[in-house]
């Protein structure tokens, strides 16, 4: 049997742009993608901490070092520039793989710079 587990997370990213007229997706600074192992075209879930909205889309790599987190297309209706979001990717794996899997979590500051890298989420922690 296969299980779907969190693979990577960008925690507390700030929305830098919302572009309604783009085809779709989320544009994310490629340095952030590399740090947690996310890839172009990968399906992600985005949770908006400001309004509770949840959506699924796919990744487009953004300019390195820019800190860009831009929601494109219809998803732009669910965010405002400055909103705090959580971007999560998932992976399917066997139960054996799941037993040793360690997700990569990047905790970001208000400029979308990595403040801390976590190998797992500690229980009952507020970040």
UniProtKB/Swiss-Prot annotation:
Cofactor(s) the record lists: pyruvate
Residue numbers of Pyruvic acid (Ser) PTMs: 25
Catalytic activity: L-aspartate + H(+) = beta-alanine + CO2
Binding site for substrate: 57, 73-75
Keyword field contains Cytoplasm: yes
Protein localization: Cytoplasm
Active site location: 25 (schiff-base intermediate with substrate), 58 (proton donor)
Post-translational modification: Is synthesized initially as an inactive proenzyme, which is activated by self-cleavage at a specific serine bond to produce a beta-subunit with a hydroxyl group at its C-terminus and an alpha-subunit with a pyruvoyl group at its N-terminus.
Principal localisation: cytoplasm
Associated pathway: Cofactor biosynthesis; (R)-pantothenate biosynthesis; beta-alanine from L-aspartate: step 1/1
Claim: Zinc is one of the keywords in the record: no
Protein keywords: Autocatalytic cleavage, Cytoplasm, Decarboxylase, Lyase, Pantothenate biosynthesis, Pyruvate, Schiff base, Zymogen
InterPro entries (alphabetical): Asp_de-COase-like_dom_sf, Asp_decarbox
Cofactor note: Binds 1 pyruvoyl group covalently per subunit.
Top EC class, one word: lyase
GO cellular component, one term: cytosol
GO biological process assignments: alanine biosynthetic process; pantothenate biosynthetic process
MF (Gene Ontology): aspartate 1-decarboxylase activity
Known EC number: 4.1.1.11
Pfam families xrefs: Asp_decarbox (PF02261)
Subunit structure: Heterooctamer of four alpha and four beta subunits.
Primary role: Catalyzes the pyruvoyl-dependent decarboxylation of aspartate to produce beta-alanine.
HAMAP family per UniProt: PanD (MF_00446)
Family as reported in the entry's similarity comment: Belongs to the PanD family.
Protein name: Aspartate 1-decarboxylase
């Amino acid at each position: 049997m296969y299980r779907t587990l969190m693979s990577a997370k960008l925690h507390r990213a700030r929305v830098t742009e919302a572009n309604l007229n783009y085809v779709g997706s989320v544009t994310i600074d490629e340095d952030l993608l590399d740090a947690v192992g996310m890839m172009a075209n990968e399906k992600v879930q985005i949770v908006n901490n400001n309004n509770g909205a949840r959506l699924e889309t796919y990744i487009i790599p953004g300019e390195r070092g820019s800190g860009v987190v831009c929601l494109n297309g219809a998803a732009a209706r669910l965010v405002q520039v400055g909103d705090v979001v959580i971007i999560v990717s998932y992976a399917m794996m066997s139960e054996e793989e799941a037993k040793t899997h360690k997700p990569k979590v990047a905790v970001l500051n208000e400029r979308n710079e990595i403040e801390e890298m976590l190998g797992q989420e500690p229980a009952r922690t507020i970040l």
